[in-house]
Amino acid sequence: MEYKTTAKLVIQACDKDLPGVFGHGCVLLLQGIAREHSLNRAAKSMGMAYSKAWRIVNEAEGQLGCKLIERDGARGSTLTPAGERAIEVYEELQADINDIIATKADASSLASKSS
């Protein structure tokens, strides 16, 4: 039987009183906002209620202490520079984690074959 090792990065403030976390789902939502220029359309494309998307963004902004999106009423939403940077940092960290897992998995695979 084959197994695959994975890990999902979650960024959370040390202050336990702050709600939510910044993780993969939030990154996907922010990427959707960047693509669709709308929180509502991004949420719909993910099969998510607008209210849930709004809550995810608000909680992530609270966790990170910065605005991730600019809301412009009927004209939609765009990512702030902080929102763009948050995606970039998350993707870099997740790639590093994936590289570490791949390296460790290769090493353990080699060790088990030589036994």
Predicted features by range, described:
Residues 56:
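Residues within the DNA-recognition helix of helix-turn-helix
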Residues 33-41:
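Short helix-boundary/capping micro-motifs
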Residues 49:
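Helix-turn-helix DNA-binding motif, specifically the short coil turn and the N-cap/start of the second
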Residues 62-78:
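A short LG(V/I)-centered, amphipathic sequence patch enriched
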